[in-house]
């Protein structure tokens, strides 16, 4: 359960600020994400890749995940997996990024930060 919450928070952190993707984005490509839990009972760290195409962030295993990377690189997150939910925000710049995330799994609450590196 801890892994699913961290996974959900991690993936969601690249959902953008509500803009819509229109054509190729400067952030298109494969990115490696690292999520670190600073508070709560979630996994201490979690790593996984995502892909950005035309500003749309995707991961094949997430059911309720959608979003876009804003042209400015600003990002905001929201993802739900079963009874787990997470949100986050931050910024991509060039080939890296960072931000914060928080979420819950039932009554358990967790939060921390994320970093991203372009492949």
Predicted regions and their residues:
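Bacterial N-terminal signal peptides
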Residues: 8-16
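Bacterial N-terminal signal peptides that target proteins for export
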Residues: 1-8
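Sec/Tat signal peptide C-region and signal peptidase I cleavage site
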Residues: 18-23
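Central antiparallel beta-sheet cores of small beta-barrel/beta-sandwich binding domains
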Residues: 24-119
């Amino acid at each position: 359960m801890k892994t699913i919450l961290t996974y959900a928070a991690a993936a969601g952190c690249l959902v953008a600020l509500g803009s819509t993707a229109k054509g190729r984005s400067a952030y298109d490509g494969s990115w490696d994400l690292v999520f670190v839990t600073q508070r709560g009972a979630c996994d201490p760290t979690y790593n996984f890749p995502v892909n950005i195409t035309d500003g749309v962030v995707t991961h094949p295993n997430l059911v309720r995940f959608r979003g876009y990377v804003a042209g400015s690189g600003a990002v905001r997150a929201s993802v739900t997996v079963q009874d787990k939910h997470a949100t986050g925000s931050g910024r991509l710049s060039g080939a890296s990024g960072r931000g914060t995330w928080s979420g819950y799994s039932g009554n358990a609450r967790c939060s921390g930060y994320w970093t991203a590196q372009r492949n």
